[in-house]
């Protein structure tokens, strides 16, 4: 067990890593393309020509924005640092793998939360009322951590090619968007679709967004949504740590 002083020291190191990631990767090509442009155009392709309420649209856009932005930073970091050999210096530093990964997650979380403010502000501008702001904020922060940890799993592949990791992550992320209630409410899906939706963490964030906006019914109880995101976060973080511990020697 680590003492309080050691935990604080590791947290400071994680924050230093996050600061480095923010400076280097926020304007990285794959992050901008897969984190901002792709979900933006995907959303426009869905909504143009359809008569949908602004509350429904903003809730779906917000969920998709947090999902894509938070899963776009962490997959880029490990392969890029493998290619540039920066990972060797990091591995030689007095820092644990868990701390290094947590630093990457923090950078991704900040990015996801910052970009998520855009659809929120757009919604408020167009008359959307946020009836449960605390629940919405909690859901966004928890989901940003969850999706960032999910991105770490993609980056555990021992490769220096960012394109390989982003291709794999895209193959997972796109199907999740279409089964998670972003475009079609979970309650309108067939029984097998609802079963699949329950396996996606994005479903629970979208459900919280629907609950937080005026006149939109959510499919699951709020407590279930929050608990599900927390459970997915723990599973993703534990799996990512184990996978990176195994793949690190192959990167050096």
Task: Indicate where each model-derived feature is located.
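Hydrophobic alpha-helical transmembrane segments of multi-pass membrane transport/permease proteins
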Residues: 24-71, 170-177, 230-236
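Alpha-helical transmembrane segments of multi-pass membrane transporters/translocases
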Residues: 39, 44-47, 130-131, 207-252
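Aromatic- and glycine-rich beta-strand/loop motifs that create alpha-glucan
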Residues: 2-38
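Transmembrane helix segments
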Residues: 46-48, 157-199
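Alpha-helical transmembrane segments and their short interhelical loops
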Residues: 97-98, 102-169, 219-230, 234-241
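Short hydrophobic, aromatic-rich alpha-helical segments embedded in or entering the lipid bilayer
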Residues: 9-17, 182-224
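Hydrophobic alpha-helical transmembrane segments of membrane proteins
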Residues: 48-80, 138-156, 182, 188, ...
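Hydrophobic alpha-helical transmembrane segments of multi-pass membrane transport proteins
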Residues: 55-123, 170, 177
């Amino acid at each position: 067990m680590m003492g309080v002083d050691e935990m604080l020291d590791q947290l400071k190191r994680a924050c230093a890593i996050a600061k480095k990631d923010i400076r280097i990767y926020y304007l990285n090509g794959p992050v901008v393309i897969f984190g901002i442009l792709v979900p933006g155009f995907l959303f426009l392709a869905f909504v143009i020509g359809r008569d949908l309420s602004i509350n429904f649209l903003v809730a779906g856009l917000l969920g998709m924005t947090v999902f894509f932005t938070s899963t776009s930073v962490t997959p880029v970091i490990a392969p890029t640092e493998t290619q540039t050999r920066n990972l060797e210096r990091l591995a030689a530093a007095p820092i644990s793998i868990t701390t290094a990964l947590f630093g990457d997650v923090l950078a991704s979380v900040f990015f996801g939360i910052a970009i998520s403010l855009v659809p929120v502000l757009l919604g408020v501008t167009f008359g959307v009322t946020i009836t449960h702001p605390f629940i919405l904020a909690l859901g966004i922060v928890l989901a940003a951590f969850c999706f960032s940890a999910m991105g770490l799993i993609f980056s555990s592949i021992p490769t220096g090619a960012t394109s390989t990791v982003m291709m794999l992550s895209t193959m997972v992320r796109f199907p999740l968007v279409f089964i998670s209630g972003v475009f079609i409410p979970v309650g309108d899906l067939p029984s097998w679709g609802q079963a699949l939706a329950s396996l996606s963490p994005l479903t629970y964030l979208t459900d919280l967004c629907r609950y937080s906006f005026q006149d939109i019914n959510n499919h699951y109880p709020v407590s279930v949504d929050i608990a599900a995101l927390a459970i997915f976060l723990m599973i993703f973080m534990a799996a990512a740590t184990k996978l990176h511990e195994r793949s690190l020697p192959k990167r050096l």
